[in-house]
Structure formats: C-alpha cells, structure tokens
Amino acid sequence: HFPNIARAVREVARVLKPVGLFLLVDNIALSDPELDDFDNRVEKWRDPSHGRSCTREEWHAFFTQAGLVVAYEENFRKTHNYDDWTVRSQLPAEEKAALEHFILASSDKIQHSYDIKTRSDGHLESFTSNAILLKGRKG
C-alpha cells in the first residue's frame, strides 16, 4: 500500500536506532512473470488501494539499498477462504463473482502454484498465497 516501497524502507532504515531491528511481514509475488502478474492482478482487483506484491528478490534489494542486512528470513504460505477474504475488503457481489471466474479460469500452472480449491458446487473455496518475514538490521 506504499506508493514508493524503496523510499519507505529507506525511511525505516534512517530512523532505526543503531541496534534496532526492522521486522517486515508481507505477501510476496513469485519471481515467475505469469505468477507475479496473477498475484498482483488478483490483489488489485480485490483491493484497489493495493500497490504491488513484491518478490522476495525485490524485498532483499530494498533492504540492501537502504543499508539494511537481512538477519533472518522465513518464507511461508497462507491459505485464504475465498468468501472470508472478499468480505474483508467489502468486494461487491458482482466483482466477487467476476474475480472468482478469473481465478478459476487461470492456467494449470497458476492453479497448482496457488493450490486453488473448489467446493462441491464448483465455486471457489480457497487459495494459498506466499508471504515473507524479514528481520533487518543496520549494516
């Protein structure tokens, strides 16, 4: 949701005490262009204020450029119940249906990567996204 992520990380580094730590938890896109595009299109569709889900490599570059050393990293996956996920953003019913159709019509590669699950009635039940925890300290 930051319009300039690199600048935001630089500002964190600037105000961080010399012994301070910066902990970041965020969704990430995968480095594959098709998966990156899918992730960011889905997030933006659900939440128009979404800026960009960065890749792991982009986050490392932001930290490095800001003078932060990655002291710890954990990559993990989060499963989202589709109905709950869209309710939280107050997505209108017609947009929810259109987004569901887009997700269900995605390529086999996307279906597998995001572990897209359907209910017995054919509607989208859940999908799994990628996230990262980074702990940075001043270099």
Where are these regions (language model features)?
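Conserved strand-to-helix beginnings and helix N-cap segments that scaffold or border functional pockets
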Residues: 5-6, 35
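Short alpha-helix
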Residues: 51-67, 73
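A short glycine-rich, Lys/Arg-flanked "PGG" loop and its adjoining helix->strand segment in the class I
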Residues: 6-21
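Conserved Class I S-adenosyl-L-methionine
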Residues: 66-139
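A short His-aromatic
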Residues: 1-2
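Conserved class I S-adenosyl-L-methionine
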Residues: 21-45
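Conserved catalytic-core motifs of GNAT/GCN5-like acyltransferases
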Residues: 48
